[in-house]
């Protein structure tokens, strides 16, 4: 195994090791701040610039300096008015001094504030998700463009020359500059040839012949000076990037909010919803987000209520699917909207309702959705228990029947942030053409 030795010299009064630790500490502080913003903010706001504050004590890089509380100094700096050579100056104590004696006399430092760009925010957000680099680059692309014709240009690649427009410009220029035509020169040459065959005795005959020759010479020189195609005539096809045609998508977020879904489970679910939103934002210009939460009853709520309401109760998952179907029929017809759904749950469900959920997906929802993702959030200790995909709760087993029949259905278990990305590989990777809607 190769060993790398860093032989770089330390900068003045600083240590490279300290600098690296400082940068790591600052990055961890930024990650913590972004994580809190994602946790407390809206899903759609993740893909935007963020104002970030850091404590002022954390933005200074460590440096070596003398300790004023230790060591001996046997000299007096020039220019002071208090001390002279030979005076004994008591050292300051190592304690912090009296508690309130100096209140109001010290100077405090404000927090250091700066703006993180959209790309920097996404870098920090993606760090825990372990996304491949190419996927990160694709997600950062805010708009997808295609090339379209946009008139003509006087410069460009030879492969883009527009012959028709070039010849049109050439023809107009030759008319404007009165370039002699080939027919005109040939007619003049025929007339000269005819006169040359006649007897040359008369003076008028010789004068006429000389005039015609001079005229022919002028026309030929003018024709050579005015080229048939000049560089100013050339036109190239011009292309400009154009956003893809407007397309609309709706993203349904379904989540179980019963007592078994704690803060860790909700945080993982929110990361999953954020990542799906970023994928869809790259494909579609307009995205609506519908939040449906359920216990033993389901309802459409706003984002704040979806994640932070304290309501809890029993668990009947089919109520969320019925509510989603109602919203689709009322506001999002499948022939006008691309429908995506993401469901997060811990797998708990009332007895007998899991079969009802599978029936709703089979008969109603999967024919309307472009993609449906089910995420079951488990504890890391349960990963070994559910080693195979066949083992699991009744809801998991019921959804396995849907997964086997619909290629646009994807299900997975998540125990930590790094488990979130694989659920997107199948949907957004290159795959053969297939009909998603049956």
Swiss-Prot record:
Residues 55-107 are annotated as: Disordered. Signal peptide: none annotated. It comes from the Bacteria. Residues 93-105 have a biased composition (Gly residues). Coiled coil: none annotated. InterPro entries: UPF0229. HAMAP family: UPF0229. Belongs to the UPF0229 family. This is UPF0229 protein R01398. It comes from Rhizobium meliloti (strain 1021) (Ensifer meliloti).
